């Protein structure tokens, strides 16, 4: 929560979006509303969403989502940690690799658990692939238009990431 809260995110109405230590808060409510909107869009387009027990549909509209049930129904595409693997064996570890194709870590969490002790990528290189490094700076002009595609069943990353970038 501390990292997300530091970004000073606001919704379209200017309301601050934050999280409490327990994961609840206005940002969690915002993410919930995005999932509901995505499911509502699918329903309106004729998709059968009845298999999702996490959704509540009343009078032809998606009215609620049980986020704990959603996490169980639409399971992860990759195991934890999804990107920076402990053994530095992921494609993302290669992306941060050396010119000699030696993979490197980009999180202290995975680096500390690596049985082979692969090196960490330099902070400057890690920052290049973190959109928040740039878009949160005052001297950066963010593109006025960009496309983020993420829907109800996307599992490559959590919706909070593209939603935060969009804000």
Label every model-predicted segment:
Residues 165-167:
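Short, well-ordered beta-strand segments
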Residues 153-157:
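Acidic catalytic loop of the alpha/beta-hydrolase fold
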Residues 147-150:
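Short beta-strand/loop motif that positions the catalytic acidic residue
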Residues 140-143:
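Proline/glycine-enriched tight loop/beta-turn segments at coil->beta junctions
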Residues 1-138:
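Accessory cap/linker subdomain of secreted extracellular hydrolases
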Residues 160-162:
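Mobile, glycine-rich extracellular loop/lid and propeptide segments
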């Amino acid at each position: 929560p501390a990292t997300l809260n530091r970004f000073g995110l606001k919704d379209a109405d200017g309301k601050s979006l934050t999280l409490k230590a327990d994961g609840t808060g206005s940002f969690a409510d915002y993410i919930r509303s995005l999932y509901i909107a995505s499911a509502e869009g699918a329903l309106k387009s004729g998709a059968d969403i009845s298999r999702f027990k996490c959704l509540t549909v009343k009078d032809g509209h998606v009215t609620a989502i049980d986020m704990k049930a959603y996490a169980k129904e639409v399971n992860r595409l990759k195991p934890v940690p999804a990107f920076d693997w402990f053994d530095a064996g992921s494609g993302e570890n290669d992306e941060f690799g050396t010119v000699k194709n030696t993979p490197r870590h980009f999180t202290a969490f995975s680096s500390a658990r690596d049985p082979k002790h692969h090196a960490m990528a330099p902070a400057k290189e890690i920052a290049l692939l973190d959109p928040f490094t740039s878009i949160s700076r005052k001297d950066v002009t963010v593109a006025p238009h960009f496309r983020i595609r993420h829907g109800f069943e996307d599992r490559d990353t959590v919706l909070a990431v593209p939603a935060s970038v969009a804000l």
